[in-house]
């Protein structure tokens, strides 16, 4: 059966380019969801981009797997500042494969075994300053926690002195990328502005920390990811430059810190006020008895915790959209894709599509019983992408989130005000305005 193709309509009529783009600028998530509700493939002009929004799993599989050689990350490169150009986040083909091979050993099962204890220690340390009845921004807390975990486990650093510099960098990066996504124009090197100057000033702060650590690893290697990269060579024996090591570390640093902090923040949000789900979680966590078990065994002991995290990822995927650009004329299903067109796949929209999910807007961890994740067709649920491009650190992120939940929830009850927290899409899906919550210490670990 041919795939439905149509240009997005606004107000019952075919949209002008400016109308569709204005809707995209005003509410990116609603726009993506309406595309999914309109057709399997929606063809729309968004400023400088000729875009196909694809909202069917088998077509997404073609783009990301079977025809992946026809597509590149050029769209992502066009909205990212050049300072990230060499990182795994933006790399294609040989460069991406080379970096991925270098990083894989840092995420092997044996490594995760050593990381788990550090994750638990950092989670314990993160809540030492919490006071019962205190109002806190949980997103800020989770950002600091995941920052400490990533820098300690993967880079062997106590990064407490670099927290503020990192927060300034990520906030500036989010502002810059948001501006580029919302712009009808594409300039690889845009005119300087206060926003771009703030970004590069923040990057210089973090670079000073990064290059100092790289030089130290060259003199005194340790058993961490940075030392692995410093000691790595290509096929002819040439070592990575400091810039290449910095780029590779930055990709892991950003993805491991930013995405997991968003996952944890949204998990606390969907749990707030759900006494029934909280009771089930606490019963499971108390029954598990210890976080010292090997990660694979720990995950196996906490199936309901995994269900809760998967459901939070379904409703609030940190990576809410993936963009690919056609490098040559190709096809997706029955539709021709021209070289230069951008294809967008949206976990946000497809995770909430009533064709694939029962009561898609409802937070229901029980839907994940009986190993639903393994039974779903590819690209029905893809918070970490899928196939060869699946996030190299996805197991790390899920272990990190599991241990944080298992450490914090038995000690503190988290409640949020009745106001709805709106998601703010930029590079990731952050909570707009933070995640204000009241933390109340539990009298016993019930």
Where is each model-derived feature located?
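Cytochrome P450 heme-thiolate monooxygenase catalytic core
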Residues: 1-8, 31, 72-78, 95, ...
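Cytochrome P450 catalytic-core helices
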Residues: 259-284, 395-411
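Conserved cytochrome P450 K-helix E-x-x-R motif and the immediately C-terminal K′/meander segment
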Residues: 19-39, 208, 212, 291-333
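Cytochrome P450 fold signature focused on the C-terminal beta-domain
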Residues: 222-228, 282-302, 315-335, 344, ...
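Cytochrome P450 proximal C-terminal region
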Residues: 3-5, 36, 123, 171, ...
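N-terminal membrane-proximal hinge/A-helix region immediately C-terminal to the signal-anchor transmembrane segment
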Residues: 1-98, 113, 117-125, 145, ...
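Conserved cytochrome P450 K-helix/beta-meander segment immediately N-terminal to the heme-binding cysteine loop
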Residues: 345-372
């Amino acid at each position: 059966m041919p795939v439905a193709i149509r240009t997005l309509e606004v107000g019952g009529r075919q949209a002008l380019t400016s109308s569709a783009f204005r809707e995209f600028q005003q509410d990116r998530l609603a726009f993506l969801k309406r595309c999914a509700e309109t057709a399997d493939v929606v063809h729309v002009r968004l400023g400088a981009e000729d875009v196909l929004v694809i909202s069917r799993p088998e077509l997404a599989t073609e783009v990301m797997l079977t025809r992946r050689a026809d597509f590149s990350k050029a769209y992502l490169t066009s909205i990212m500042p050049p300072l990230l150009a060499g990182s795994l986040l933006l790399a294609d083909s040989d460069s991406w494969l080379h970096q991925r091979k270098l990083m894989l050993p840092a995420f092997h099962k044996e490594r995760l075994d050593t990381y788990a204890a550090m994750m638990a220690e950092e989670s314990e340390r993160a809540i030492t300053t919490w006071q019962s009845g205190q109002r806190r921004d949980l997103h800020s807390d989770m950002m600091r926690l995941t920052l400490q975990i990533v820098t300690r486990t993967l880079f062997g650093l106590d990064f407490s002195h670099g927290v503020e510099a990192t927060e300034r960098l990520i906030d500036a990066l989010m502002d810059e990328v948001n501006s580029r996504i919302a712009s009808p124009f594409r300039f690889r090197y845009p005119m300087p502005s206060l926003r771009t100057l703030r970004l590069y000033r923040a990057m210089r702060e973090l670079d000073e920390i990064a290059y100092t650590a790289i030089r130290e690893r060259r003199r005194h290697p340790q058993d961490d990811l940075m030392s692995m990269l410093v000691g790595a060579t290509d096929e002819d024996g040439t070592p990575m430059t400091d810039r290449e090591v910095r780029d590779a570390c930055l990709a892991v640093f950003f993805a491991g810190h930013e995405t997991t902090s968003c996952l944890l923040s949204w998990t606390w949000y969907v749990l707030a006020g759900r006494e029934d789900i909280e009771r089930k979680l606490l019963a499971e966590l108390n029954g598990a008895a210890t976080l010292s078990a090997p990660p694979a065994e720990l995950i196996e002991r906490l199936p309901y915790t995994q269900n809760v995290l998967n459901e939070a990822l379904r409703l609030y995927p940190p990576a809410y959209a993936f963009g690919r650009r056609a490098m040559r004329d190709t096809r997706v299903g029955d539709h021709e894709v021209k070289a230069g067109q951008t294809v967008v796949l949206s976990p946000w929209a497809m995770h909430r599509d009533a064709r694939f999910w029962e009561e898609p807007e409802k937070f229901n961890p029980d839907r994940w019983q009986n190993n639903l994740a393994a039974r779903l067709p590819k690209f029905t649920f893809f918070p970490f992408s899928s196939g060869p491009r699946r996030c190299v650190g996805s197991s790390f992120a899920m272990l990190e989130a599991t241990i944080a939940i298992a450490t914090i929830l038995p000690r503190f009850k988290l409640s949020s005000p009745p106001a709805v927290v709106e998601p703010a899409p930029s590079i990731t899906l952050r909570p707009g305005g933070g995640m204000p919550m009241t933390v109340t210490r539990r009298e016993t670990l019930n």
